[in-house]
Amino acid sequence: MRIGLYGGSFNPAHAGHLHVSRTALRRLRLDRVWWLVTPGNPLKDHGVLAPLDERVAQARALATDPRIAVTGFEGGIGSRYTADTLRWLVRRQPALHFVWIMGADSLGTFHRWRRFDEILSLMPVAVIDRPGYTLTAPSARAAQAFASARIPEADAPTLATRPTPAWAFLHGPRSALSSTALRTR
C-alpha cells in the first residue's frame, strides 16, 4: 500500500490541504494520505496554535474523502520532529510505501528542519507547487543539496517505490489558501 504523509499544524485545516492531498493521491497514485496534525512546530509561533484536539477534530470534519485519514498521534509518541515521527512509522509499518508530502513553500525552509537529510533517507518526498514558489522552490538549499535525487515529474507515479533519497516537484493547479491568511481574517 502507498501512503502519503502530510504533516502540518492544520491551524486551521482548509481546502488547500485537500487540494494538496488530492493532487498527491492522483499524481503519485497513492492509496491513502494521512494528515499528521503536529502538537507543535518548532519553527512556528505556538502562541497562535489552537489545541491539538481542536485542530484534529476540525481537520476530520473537513477531510470527508475516505482516502484521507487524520491523526494527532505524534503527541502520543512524544515526537517533536518530523524525522523522529517518520522513523517511528517506518519501523512499525515496514510493508507500507510512504511518501512525505510538502508544499513548495516549505521546501524553502526544509534545510532548517532538524535532520532534514534523514527525512530524505527514510522515504521519498513529493513537493507540491504553491503560488509564488514555482521558480524559487527548486533552487532552495535542500533542493540543491539533493539535486541528484530529484526525479522527472513524469516519473512521479513511481516515487513511492523508489530507493531513497528521491524527490519530485509536482507542477499543476495551485491553491493560494494558507492557514496563516485564514487566521488573520
UniProtKB/Swiss-Prot annotation:
Presence of keyword Transferase: yes
Gene Ontology molecular function terms on file: ATP binding; nicotinate-nucleotide adenylyltransferase activity
Any GO BP annotation: NAD biosynthetic process
Top-tier EC class: transferase
Its EC number(s): 2.7.7.18
Keyword Transport appears in the UniProt entry: no
Gene3D superfamilies in UniProt: HUPs (3.40.50.620)
Pathway annotation from the record: Cofactor biosynthesis; NAD(+) biosynthesis; deamido-NAD(+) from nicotinate D-ribonucleotide: step 1/1
Substrates-to-products reaction catalysed: nicotinate beta-D-ribonucleotide + ATP + H(+) = deamido-NAD(+) + diphosphate
Keywords: ATP-binding, NAD, Nucleotide-binding, Nucleotidyltransferase, Pyridine nucleotide biosynthesis, Transferase
Described purpose of this protein according to its UniProt entry: Catalyzes the reversible adenylation of nicotinate mononucleotide (NaMN) to nicotinic acid adenine dinucleotide (NaAD).
NCBIfam families cross-referenced by the UniProt entry: nicotinate (nicotinamide) nucleotide adenylyltransferase, PRK00071.2-2, PRK00071.2-4
Family recorded in the similarity comment: Belongs to the NadD family.
Protein name: Probable nicotinate-nucleotide adenylyltransferase
Organism: Methylorubrum extorquens (strain CM4 / NCIMB 13688)
Lineage: Bacteria, Pseudomonadati, Pseudomonadota, Alphaproteobacteria, Hyphomicrobiales
Gene: nadD
